[in-house]
Design a protein with these regions (language model features):
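Disordered, charged N-terminal biogenesis/targeting segments of membrane/secreted proteins
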Residues: 1-13
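A residue-level detector for the "anchor" residue at the start of short, highly conserved motifs
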Residues: 10-24, 31-263
Length: 263
């Protein structure tokens, strides 16, 4: 009889322990499921926030300050985008067109500019990036500090210091670095047009953006010409600029509304 009672007591004890483990396992499973749901929801919330986009339409320039204090100028026909968590989760922007950056220094969060063809990284510097989709080249000009960059399709790194320029040939994928007075190519911030030997094709694309017109070079023999000069965009109309350039005798032009023909 005592042995029978002992077995009953042991069976009850085992059933009590088994129920406790089942209860603990259920609580643990509920916790895991809740945590997984929370993380999934957290990711969903982050993903649901659209990036902030700012644009400089054709014929205009735009000045802005990013949440971390970085100053940005966008040239005509350019766009920049960054996440809602910029300055907290990281400092990365996407850009198309041309932008000038005065980056707020923060060694713990490097600043990154990603374009269609380039990836530029730095901590706190002043630099200019130009990468329009229709251009044959993408260019980075460093005014102050240091940056490291690479072709978006290559892991090869290039380091720039003060007054250096990196030029990516989009057709070959080759990047060349040389010395350059960076201020010459950032005068657009103050409304200047600086021509440094660009071809008539590149100049036409540039004028299309800043004057919001359509330019056609009808005489293909003119494509070989390159031009130098300085103009004040806010004070000189497109007609005045083309008049000055045409006095070289290398081309003539006509304007009908927003359409310009160079011949």
């Amino acid at each position: 009889y005592q042995l029978f009672l002992q077995r009953i007591t042991e069976d009850r004890h085992h059933r009590h322990i088994n129920r406790w483990w089942l209860y603990a396992a259920a609580v643990l499973a509920l916790f895991i499921a809740s945590y997984a749901s929370y993380k999934s929801g957290e990711h969903g919330v982050k993903s649901s926030f659209a990036d902030i986009e700012i644009e400089a339409p054709q014929g205009s320039r735009t000045k802005l300050n990013l949440p971390d204090g970085t100053l940005v100028w966008l040239n005509a026909g350019s766009r920049i985008a960054y996440s809602q968590g910029f300055g907290v989760d990281g400092r990365s922007v996407k850009m198309s067109g041309e932008g000038y950056f005065e980056v707020k220094k923060n060694p713990e969060l490097p600043f990154t500019v990603k374009t269609e063809n380039l990836l530029v990284r730095d901590i706190g510097t002043k630099f200019n990036v130009r990468d329009y989709h229709e251009d044959t080249e993408a260019v980075v000009l460093l005014s102050e500090g240091k940056v490291v960059l690479n072709d978006a399709h290559s892991a090869d790194l290039y380091y720039l210091t003060n007054n250096q320029r990196a030029v990516l040939n989009k057709s070959t994928g080759k990047i060349e670095v040389d010395s350059y007075v960076a201020s010459n190519s950032t005068k657009w911030i103050n409304g200047y047009i600086q021509l440094n030997g660009e071809s008539i094709v590149d100049i036409a694309k540039y004028f299309e953006r800043i004057y919001n017109v359509r330019i056609t070079v009808s005489d293909k023999r003119k494509l070989k010409y390159h031009f130098y000069g300085n103009f004040k965009r806010n004070e000189q109309s497109l007609t005045e600029v083309l008049d000055a350039m045409s006095k070289t005798g290398k081309f003539k032009y006509s304007i009908k509304g927003h359409n310009v023909t160079i011949y």
